[in-house]
Every structure is written in structure tokens, then in C-alpha cells.
């Protein structure tokens, strides 16, 4: 069954209201994208909980999907009227039904982290049979290895982790770093996340990779310290969790922090230098990683 896809260009003041109104009046879905994406006017936005940052592009486009026989024009008129918009211009096209699973799978290829470390979706053959291959499929939890912060943490584990060390992955998402630590020689690895879906995803991914990783919600994490603590989260949580993460790190143990932007590294380094001797920040595409040894 084909679908009708409608695109409306609007400004940031009404984009969210229009998307909500389209859904209320019968659209199957409504998404907001940067109307200038792919041009020199593309606007990069990084959202972070608790931080005052603009979340909608100044020039946005609302993309709505309708069934083949839905009265899309009537829905658009009703939504526009609700938002106080007159003579709302839009474009439409027909989207043929597809094997969406196969289409999605085709968009995810194996990711090379280093000569010996790859992230490989389950439907792909391992590109390097002798390498460490993390079997990971895109899902609801963050962390497929494509993001610079995940790569930065994986590269640290690949080059710095020592055999037999214990690892805490705080803010584990999909469990990719927890699983990688075990495959790279950790003696034990524990993942923690505030999202129950992430905990379930981590357990499923660990089973797929045949590793004995443990995953917990924060309140369920057993007491104890670790040789290595990794936290690939955002700057604001890192600010608040510093004392706790330091307490979870053994004396002489090491910490790895990412999820922060280049310009946030100096500030975060100042906070964590209370407990750690930090190395210079490593960066990748505007994102940074801090690491160091607990005094």
C-alpha cells in the first residue's frame, strides 16, 4: 500500500505545534527536520537535558505521512487553522510501500573502529574473521558505534584496557562499551542505565555476543569499585555525577568520559581534576573524550 508524504516549510515558532496538530487530525506520523539540511545554511543543533538550548531549526520542514486514501488536504487545512496559519503551502509525493526491515538493514554496514575491532550487524558477515567483532543491531537504546563519542570510548578500550580489569559502563545505552570491554579482555563488566529499555537491550546484546555482562538500573547497582569507569553520557549529567563516579573508581584506577563537546572539555576537566590526573582531551568531529588516573 502506498502512502502520501506531505512536506510543509515553516519557521521554528510553529513547527512543533503544526506537527502535533497534524497528528491530532489524522496524520500517521509527523517529523520535523532542518529545511536547510545539506546546504551551507544547515544548522547544527546539539540538545542536552537541563541546558537552555534551541531545539528547533529556525527554518524547519514538517514531514507528515498519510494513508493512500486519507484526506491529507483536509487534515492540513484543519491543522493550519488550529495553528493560525493561512494559505499554508505544501508539497506532496507518493511513497511506495517497501520491505522496511530490509531497507533499514541496508543502511547499516559494519563499522571499523581499529584494525582488530569492528561493529557488525547480525545480518552481515564479519568483515575480518580474526578481529574482535561486536554483533550489534540498531535498536531503541543509544549506541551503535557510529557516533564519535562511542568511537572515542571504544578506541580507548581497544588500546588501554588491561586483561582481567573490572569495568563499569555508566550510562550504557545498548551495552556496546560493556560488551566491548569483555571481548577485549576485561575480567568483568557492568552496565548501568536509568532507562529500563537500555538495560533490556544491553542484556539482549550481551547474549547475542556470548559474553557474561551484567546490567542494572542505578538503584540496583551493587556496592563496589572498579578498575575502569566509563561514562559516555552528556556534559550536564557528568557535572552532577563526578563525585559518585570517582567513588566507584579504585585508587589508581582509570576513568573515561565522553558525550561532551570540544568546548566543554576544559570545564569538565576542571571538575574531575579534583580526583583524577587527566590526560589531554582527545577529539572527534567536535566531540571530546577525557581520561585519567585516580589519585
UniProtKB/Swiss-Prot annotation:
Q: Name the CDD domains for this protein.
A: AdoMet_MTases
Instruction: Kindly list the GO CC terms recorded for this protein.
Output: cytosol
Query: Record's Pfam families?
Result: PrmA
UniProt entry keywords in alphabetical sequence: Cytoplasm, Methyltransferase, S-adenosyl-L-methionine, Transferase
Q: Which NCBIfam families match?
A: prmA
Give the family from UniProt. Belongs to the methyltransferase superfamily. PrmA family.
Tell me the function of this protein: Methylates ribosomal protein L11.
The protein depicted here goes by the name Ribosomal protein L11 methyltransferase
Q: Which organism is it from?
A: Neisseria gonorrhoeae (strain ATCC 700825 / FA 1090)
Amino acid at each position: 500500500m502506498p502512502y502520501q508524504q506531505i512536506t510543509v516549510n515553516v519557521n521554528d515558532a510553529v513547527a512543533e505545534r503544526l506537527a502535533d496538530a497534524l497528528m491530532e487530525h489524522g496524520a500517521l506520523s509527523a517529523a520535523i527536520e532542518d529545511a536547510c539540511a545539506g546546504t551551507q545554511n544547515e544548522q547544527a543543533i546539539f540538545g542536552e537535558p537541563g541546558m537552555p538550548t534551541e531545539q528547533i531549526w529556525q527554518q524547519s520542514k514538517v514531514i507528515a505521512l498519510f494513508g493512500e486514501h486519507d484526506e491529507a488536504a483536509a487534515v492540513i487545512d484543519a491543522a493550519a487553522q488550529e495553528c493560525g496559519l493561512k494559505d499554508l503551502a505544501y508539497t506532496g509525493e507518493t511513497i511506495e510501500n517497501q520491505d522496511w526491515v530490509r531497507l533499514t538493514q541496508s543502511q547499516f554496514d559494519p563499522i571499523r573502529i581499529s584494525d582488530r575491532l569492528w561493529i557488525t550487524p547480525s545480518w552481515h558477515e564479519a568483515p575480518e574473521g580474526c578481529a574482535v567483532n561486536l554483533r550489534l543491531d540498531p535498536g531503541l537504546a543509544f549506541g551503535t558505534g557510529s557516533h564519535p563519542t562511542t568511537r572515542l570510548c571504544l578506541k580507548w578500550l581497544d588500546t588501554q584496557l588491561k586483561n582481567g580489569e573490572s569495568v563499569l559502563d555508566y550510562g550504557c545505552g545498548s551495552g556496546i562499551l560493556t560488551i566491548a570491554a569483555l571481548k577485549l579482555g576485561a575480567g568483568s563488566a557492568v552496565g548501568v542505565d536509568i532507562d529500563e529499555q537500555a538495560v533490556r537491550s544491553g542484556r539482549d546484546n550481551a547474549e547475542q555476543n556470548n559474553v557474561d555482562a551484567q546490567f542494572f538500573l542505578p538503584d540496583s547497582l551493587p556496592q563496589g569499585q572498579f578498575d575502569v569507569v566509563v561514562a559516555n553520557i552528556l556534559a550536564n549529567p557528568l557535572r552532577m555525577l563526578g563525585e559518585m563516579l570517582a567513588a566507584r573508581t579504585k585508587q589508581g584506577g582509570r576513568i573515561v568520559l565522553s558525550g561532551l563537546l570540544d568546548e566543554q572539555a576544559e570545564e569538565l576537566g576542571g571538575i574531575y581534576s579534583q580526583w583524577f590526573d587527566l590526560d589531554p582531551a582527545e577529539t572527534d568531529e567536535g566531540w571530546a573524550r577525557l581520561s585519567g588516573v585516580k589519585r
